[in-house]
């Protein structure tokens, strides 16, 4: 294998060619940073969190492929992944994951002690999630916790504390992750049933679409409550209304459970995250005394 081929395999291992995972992890982190800083996050902290998100998501992908190295060859969507296809070794995947995790840890060392302490459970959750599909009926809930840890870390880095509001945002994001990752799981449900993998799409059975919609509703309702506590204005609530419209569009995509359409719905969640961030950003830029 040439150097270019190996570099391409490494890039595909950590999914740099598929940035959707980075974006879905980044949006709630940015929500947390902007709300913690009331619209004026420290530039150094912002850069650290953006780079850290990229590094940890990439490390998580490498760990995921290591954990699923004997499963991926039997799933049509994943059989061509570098590790499953034999282009790289399990040892290489572990070394890459460890290297990226170390870089992410070194990156946060300039931040306060609380942020560094929170990075420990964040790393554990990211590293252990891929193995939960063997014994958890709802591994998407575990992923939701892992994908939400950027929020308390953002508050800790920006303010030195983790207030109840941060955990309310974690709760909201948890249900969002369950919703979009269940859409993702619908793509592979037929293969997962054959090989015995557990996912929320399998656990929910015929209530899968209803469960996704319920999780989206809880997600948006919790954000609405957070907005009330923070006395947010029209831009924030307008963004939530747009996000609700996007959820309705997603329902049209997933209601027939066609794998290709379910995957499109999963990708569509990037726009929900972006719209909510835009609402938070505009709300802090054009703050008025009026709020709902």
UniProtKB/Swiss-Prot annotation:
Any GO molecular function: 4-hydroxybenzoate polyprenyltransferase activity
Enzyme Commission code(s) on record: 2.5.1.39
Record-linked InterPro entries: HB_polyprenyltransferase-like (IPR006370), Prenyltransferase (IPR039653), UbiA_prenyltransferase (IPR000537), UbiA_prenylTrfase_CS (IPR030470), UbiA_sf (IPR044878)
Keyword Chloroplast: no
Keyword Ribonucleoprotein appears in the UniProt entry: no
Alphabetical UniProt keywords: Cell inner membrane, Cell membrane, Magnesium, Membrane, Transferase, Transmembrane, Transmembrane helix, Ubiquinone biosynthesis
GO CC term, one of those recorded: plasma membrane
Topology term for the membrane: Multi-pass membrane protein
Alphabetical list of Pfam families matching this protein: UbiA
Locations listed in the record: Cell inner membrane
PANTHER family registered for this protein in UniProt: 4-HYDROXYBENZOATE POLYPRENYLTRANSFERASE, MITOCHONDRIAL (PTHR11048:SF28), PRENYLTRANSFERASES (PTHR11048)
Recorded family membership: Belongs to the UbiA prenyltransferase family.
UniProt-listed NCBIfam families: ubiA_proteo
Protein name from the UniProt record: 4-hydroxybenzoate octaprenyltransferase
Gene from which the chain derives: ubiA
């Amino acid at each position: 294998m040439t150097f270019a081929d190996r570099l391409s395999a490494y890039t595909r291992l950590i999914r740099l060619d598929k940035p959707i995972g980075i974006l879905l992890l980044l949006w709630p982190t940015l929500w947390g940073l902007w709300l913690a800083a009331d619209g004026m996050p420290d530039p150094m902290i912002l850069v650290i969190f953006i780079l850290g998100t990229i590094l940890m998501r990439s490390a998580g992908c490498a760990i995921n492929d290591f954990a699923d190295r004997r499963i991926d060859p039997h799933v049509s969507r994943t059989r061509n992944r570098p590790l499953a296809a034999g282009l790289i070794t399990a040892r290489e995947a572990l070394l890459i994951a460890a290297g990226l995790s170390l870089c992410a840890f070194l990156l946060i060392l300039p931040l306060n002690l609380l942020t560094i302490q929170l990075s420990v459970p964040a790393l554990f959750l990211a590293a252990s999630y891929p193995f939960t599909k063997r014994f958890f009926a709802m591994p998407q809930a575990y992923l939701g916790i892992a994908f939400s840890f950027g929020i308390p870390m953002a508050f800790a880095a920006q303010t030195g504390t983790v207030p109840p509001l941060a955990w309310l945002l974690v709760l909201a994001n948890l249900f969002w992750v369950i919703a979009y990752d269940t859409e993702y799981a619908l793509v592979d449900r037929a293969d997962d049933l054959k090989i015995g993998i557990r996912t929320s799409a399998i656990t929910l059975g015929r209530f899968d679409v209803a469960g996704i919609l319920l999780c989206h509703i809880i997600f948006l309702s919790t954000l609405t409550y957070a907005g009330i506590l923070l006395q947010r204005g029209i831009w924030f609530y307008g963004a939530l209304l747009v996000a609700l419209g996007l959820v309705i569009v997603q329902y049209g995509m997933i209601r027939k459970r066609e794998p290709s359409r379910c995957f499109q719905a999963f990708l569509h969640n990037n726009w929900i995250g972006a719209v909510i961030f835009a609402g938070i950003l505009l709300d802090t830029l054009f703050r008025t005394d009026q709020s709902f």
